[in-house]
């Protein structure tokens, strides 16, 4: 892969969609669609991802995850306000994770990509992943396609696509941002929702829960999913999480649900448990 590098002054430490590293400006391949968010220190995970994508000869790039030392500067690019006080609802690690996803949405727009596939670095890929990561099978009005098999949903209004898969409208909340596609239309839509606002909710809760309330938000699930997180496949020996300690630290700061919200949430939980079906991985 060809990487263009030019020297720049230090005050341009971080720009979108290019990344300043050791005095150099790293230009991402404008034709690349597959990006894996990963801390530079997570060499075990990076080795796993290189092997996983290599099995199917799938091209990809690592996106160096936003770290706590640059989250303030990165947030300013989008006029996002952060709470890093003792009462913060997100840890610095969770903020960096969310900003990493947001920067990639912006990268898609800046590089005029018609879509971008975003992954986290603990996934396993399923069959026909290479073909299914060429996103030419969803309608033009779709914002987000979830690729990951995670949780239950209602399988209604199926649309048959390639490799014996279907896509279904997502109508109930999901968790996890380990594998999903954002279209150009979706990148613009998501950025408009997060710019000029506080960031106090984890990125997966935004994309696969909070934004579902907007009637014009078009999001679909690929089923069977083509990726799954390591802890789902290997619950007894998963990759160690770099975010869990921070999550535990801010857990007590989360907003308490009202009685009405608790009733509504419980009703939804029972409904999905009784009538929902697990998204399969293949």
UniProtKB/Swiss-Prot annotation:
Q: Which domain of life is it from?
A: Bacteria
User: What would be one Pfam family of this protein?
Assistant: Glyco_transf_25
Which InterPro entries does the protein's record reference?
Glyco_trans_25
Listed A to Z, the keywords are: Glycosyltransferase, Transferase
Q: What is its EC number?
A: 2.-.-.-
UniProt lists the family membership as follows: Belongs to the glycosyltransferase 25 family.
- The name on file for this protein is Putative glycosyltransferase HI_0765
């Amino acid at each position: 892969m060809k990487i263009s590098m030019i020297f720049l002054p230090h005050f341009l430490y971080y720009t979108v969609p290019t990344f300043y590293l050791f005095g150099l400006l790293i230009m991402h391949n404008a034709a690349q669609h597959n990006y894996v968010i990963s801390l530079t220190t997570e060499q075990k995970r990076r080795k796993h991802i290189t092997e996983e994508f290599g099995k199917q000869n799938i091209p990809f790039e690592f996106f160096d995850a936003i770290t706590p030392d640059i989250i303030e500067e990165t947030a300013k690019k989008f006029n996002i306000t952060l709470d890093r006080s003792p009462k913060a609802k997100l840890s610095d690690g969770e903020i960096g994770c969310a900003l990493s996803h947001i920067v990639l949405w912006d990268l898609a727009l800046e590089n005029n990509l018609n879509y971008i596939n975003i992954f986290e670095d603990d996934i396993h890929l399923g069959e026909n992943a290479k073909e299914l990561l060429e996103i030419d099978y969803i309608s033009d009005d779709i914002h987000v396609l979830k690729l990951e098999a995670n949780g239950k949903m209602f399988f209604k209004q199926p649309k048959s696509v390639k490799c014996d898969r279907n896509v279904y409208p997502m109508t109930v909340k999901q968790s996890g941002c380990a594998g999903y596609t954002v279209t150009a239309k979706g990148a613009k839509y998501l950025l408009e929702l997060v710019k000029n606002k506080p960031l106090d909710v984890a990125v997966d809760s935004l994309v696969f829960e909070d934004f579902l309330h907007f009637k014009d938000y078009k999001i679909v699930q690929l089923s069977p999913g083509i990726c799954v997180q390591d802890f789902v496949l290997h619950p007894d020996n998963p990759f160690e999480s770099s975010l869990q300690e921070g999550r535990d630290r801010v857990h007590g700061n989360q907003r308490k649900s009202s009685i009405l919200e608790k009733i509504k949430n419980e009703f939804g939980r029972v409904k999905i448990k009784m009538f929902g079906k697990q998204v399969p991985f293949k």
